[in-house]
Curated annotation (Swiss-Prot):
Positions carrying Leucine amide: L31
UniProt key word Secreted: yes
Name by which UniProt lists this protein: U-limacoditoxin(13)-As2
Cell compartments where the protein resides: Secreted
Single GO MF descriptor: toxin activity
Signal peptide (UniProt feature, chain positions): 1-21
Keywords recorded for this protein, A-Z: Amidation, Secreted, Signal, Toxin
GO cellular component, one term: extracellular region
Family, similarity comment: Belongs to the FARP (FMRFamide related peptide) family.
Organism: Acharia stimulea (Saddleback caterpillar moth)
């Protein structure tokens, strides 16, 4: 259970890091 949440968190953080210099707000909207 914890592993799934950890993987999801890492994926989100990785994507945020990749799009940090582009448009993080749009990225969050897409995820949400």
């Amino acid at each position: 259970m914890s592993k799934l949440l950890l993987i999801l968190a890492l994926a989100v953080l990785a994507q945020c890091a990749l799009v940090a210099g582009d448009k993080p707000k749009d990225n969050f909207i897409r995820l949400g």
